[in-house]
């Protein structure tokens, strides 16, 4: 088995169960898509709130008390963003991206680390916390993206990111990759990620790059949806969508099927 450990201040027990739950479920879910977690243990280590971040090293994650251990989170409130769960899930994603697949020092490399870890966290959040928590988190991602974009003179496409555009490689990536998985199909999208990590796990000389990731994704994407990959990674695309009509049908369980044109 895998030993899961959290080292914490004795009085900072508020979110330990949530963080441990995220560790367990990340290992199970990511392992089913990307391949097994490769270590005998995983440790989270609390540090004081002089800084507010977490950073994932192989099997060890230093984690600020400010964004996990002492946050006031109501797990029963679907409108309360479950930051300890999400941050843990994101950092656990790094155990695969980039600790198993690490991009070369070229444009787009940071997306392969941060963007794919962010997608992993969003998809796990959707799976474990439901639609209301997912929608709140996606709104958070969108707001952070728009705030970051406002301070950039010219937004580059994902494929051309240099590494310091956090609003793209974190927030835009999490939002757009989750949307892409919904449109292409979660099984197809995750199969592409599994295929990519299977091909390039621990590869170096040369290291893989974002172009190879995009090519692998195209292999699993239907022909009529190939444009979505081009629009997402290679261009800055603004869609002019609008609803012409809407029809709702109530189901026997009180839910609704909504059809939009």
Where are these regions (language model features)?
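Hydrophobic alpha-helical and helix-loop surface patches within well-folded domains
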Residues: 6-255, 259-260
């Amino acid at each position: 088995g895998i030993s899961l450990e959290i080292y914490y201040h004795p009085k900072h027990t508020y979110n330990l169960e949530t963080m441990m739950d995220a560790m367990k479920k990340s290992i199970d879910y990511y392992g089913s898509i990307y391949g097994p977690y490769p270590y005998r243990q995983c440790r989270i280590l609390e540090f004081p709130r002089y800084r507010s971040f977490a950073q994932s090293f192989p099997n060890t994650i230093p984690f600020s008390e400010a964004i996990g251990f002492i946050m006031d989170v109501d797990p029963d409130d679907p409108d309360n963003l479950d930051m300890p769960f999400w941050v843990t899930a994101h950092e656990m994603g790094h155990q695969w991206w980039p600790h198993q697949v690490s991009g070369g020092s070229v444009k787009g490399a940071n997306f392969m680390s941060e963007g794919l870890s962010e997608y992993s966290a969003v998809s796990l959040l959707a799976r474990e916390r439901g639609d209301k928590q997912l929608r709140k988190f996606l709104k958070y991602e969108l707001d952070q993206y728009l705030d970051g974009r406002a301070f950039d003179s010219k937004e580059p496409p994902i494929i051309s990111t240099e590494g310091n555009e956090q609003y793209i490689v974190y927030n835009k990536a999490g939002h757009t990759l989750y949307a892409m998985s919904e449109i292409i199909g979660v099984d197809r999208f995750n199969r592409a990620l599994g295929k990519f990590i299977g091909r390039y796990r621990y590869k170096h000389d040369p290291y893989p790059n974002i172009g190879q990731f995009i090519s692998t994704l195209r292999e699993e994407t239907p022909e009529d949806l190939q444009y979505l990959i081009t629009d997402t990674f290679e261009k800055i695309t603004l869609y002019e969508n609008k609803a012409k009509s809407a029809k709702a049908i109530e189901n026997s369980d009180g839910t609704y099927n909504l059809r939009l044109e």
